């Protein structure tokens, strides 16, 4: 288990400074930070390689990338141009040697502002729109398979992800383990048991306090406080042989990246 940070700056020097301040040398880099994305709406493999080389010269390793978040329209088949650009970006990542991408495929469907018991998302398996969602996954997974890119799907719903895996089978169709799954009523400590370590391509570290059932009633707090036992989460990954990156995020008021990194490193070292 290695600790890294998210990076979204277009300035390699700034990213290197952020890494030094945090005490890490690995990042998951936003595709939007790569030169050319803003102009074209997608990245090329050459631009990914070049930016990665620039970061490497500054002692920073790009361990993975963060894919653009698709709109609801793109997922449901209503924006082919956006979907095509997303696929170009995924292909470029793999061609450039990126091993994994943090991917938020269904964020456009999450009820961020409303609470519907038993319905964390606007479209659930078997409902209208679900067939389109599966077609979307087939499309992006086929691209990932072509270039051997691991899709670390950021999906909190355990059973929903299993349904997607059953419909779109691929060793590259995996998951980001994020304790935010607690917001969906899932157990944030049992991801290894529920998904299998071979499917976990990337990890977040975050903690929350639940004040009520809706999304807005979960409070973000530093890693060493809250309802989630982060030590247990890290221990389960280490014991299962996870050989990847964990990135702290959503640290709440008073939380800092450098403190979170130090805390995670201490846990990894058995402290």
Question: What kind of region is each of these model predictions?
Answer:
Residues 103-108, 137, 154-157, 249-251:
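Short, well-ordered beta-to-alpha junction loops that form the rim of enzyme active sites
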Residues 2, 26, 61, 150, ...:
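Residues at the starts of beta-strands that form the adenosine-phosphate
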Residues 1-38, 42-44:
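N-terminal basic, low-complexity leaders that serve as flexible interaction/assembly modules and, when applicable
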Residues 2-4, 9-20, 53-58, 73-76, ...:
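Histidine-acidic metal/acid-base catalytic patches
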Residues 30-134, 181:
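Structural motif corresponding to the early beta-alpha repeats
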Residues 123-131, 146-151, 220:
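Surface-exposed cleft-lining segments at the edges of enzyme active sites
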Residues 150-159, 163:
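Extended, basic/helix-rich recognition subdomains
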